[in-house]
């Protein structure tokens, strides 16, 4: 099951961007250590022009109980369509069972100005 979390992004006066991050598991057969995750980043404009927006990378931290942490960097989006950036996962062994926490940062530029959006912190539950 994907985890979908929506947060508010850049604010410029009354205009803003909203980021909707969807994380899902790679359910290809095989050992769990060879599986990975993917995400799509849906950018919803709330009165802000999307033309000057470019997204460079998304850094996602997964934290399990017992302080076991995985970090994965999503960069070079494989697809950009209608304000949706799709990223493939880098890294292995990211599929686990149980409940943990997840944190994401979005790196990009708007109108040539760099920004880092500490997007969201949430809980994720993976059942199988």
What annotation goes with each model-predicted range?
Residues 1-4, 41, 76:
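Short intrinsically disordered, low-complexity coil segments enriched in acidic
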Residues 1-18:
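A eukaryote-biased signal for short, well-structured alpha-helical docking elements
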Residues 7, 21, 55-57:
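A structural signal for short, hydrophobic beta-strand segments that form beta-sheets
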Residues 17-45, 51-52:
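Contiguous beta-strand segments within globular domains
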Residues 35-39, 56, 100-102:
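A generic structural signal for short beta-strands and their flanking turns/coil linkers
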Residues 44-50, 64-118:
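Short, solvent-exposed, Trp/other aromatic-anchored flexible loops in extracytoplasmic proteins
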Residues 53-64:
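Short acidic, flexible loop segments centered on an aromatic residue
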Residues 114-128:
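Short beta-strand elements
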């Amino acid at each position: 099951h994907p985890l979908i979390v929506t947060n508010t992004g850049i604010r410029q006066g009354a205009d803003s961007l909203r980021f909707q991050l969807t994380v899902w598991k790679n359910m290809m057969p095989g050992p769990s250590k060879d599986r990975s995750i993917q995400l799509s980043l849906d950018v919803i404009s709330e009165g802000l022009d999307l033309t000057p927006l470019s997204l460079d990378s998304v850094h996602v931290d997964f934290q399990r109980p017992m302080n076991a942490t995985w970090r994965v960097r999503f960069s070079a989006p494989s697809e950009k369509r209608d304000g949706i950036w799709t990223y493939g996962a880098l890294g292995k062994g990211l599929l686990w069972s149980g409940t943990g926490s997840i944190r994401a940062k979005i790196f990009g530029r708007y109108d040539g100005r760099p920004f880092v959006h500490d997007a969201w912190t949430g809980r994720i539950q993976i059942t199988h």
